[in-house]
Amino acid sequence: MRMKKDIRAYEYEELQKELERLGEKPFRAKQIYEWLHVKLADRFDEMTNLSVKLREKLAEEYDIFPVQMAERQQSKLDGTNKFLFRLYDGNMVESVLMRYKHGNSVCISSQAGCRMGCVFCASTIGGLKRNLSASEMLGQIYQIQKIIGERVSNVVIMGT
């Protein structure tokens, strides 16, 4: 069984070309891109302005690899939230949300695992597994935005 491509990994122009390859009009790329990156859809069946046939075709060709929240901890001291996310392959990554007057900042993982050995961080257990895709890094931000119902305004990327 072949692994499907992650549709979130495509830049806008690449998505247009992919849809043309599938026999679709270029304007569909804008609709899908908006579902993926503005409305934060995790499934093709959420894309209600696309025909059922197109959604089925997309599901045959592509996956949307969402990160799934496994755990959330909130600091009683300052309200900082730490998230543990599960990736499509079972690897786990950590992200941190810090709320400020000027907006929401997140620290996201760029790697599954870590070689640094910091005692306060669960990511270091087991060492470095692999680098994350851009889509997986975006997925952390998107999931946090969905969970808190607010926009993230600043991003810090953790990794070695």
Question: Residue ranges of each PLM-predicted region?
Answer:
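Conserved Radical SAM active-site core
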Residues: V93-T160
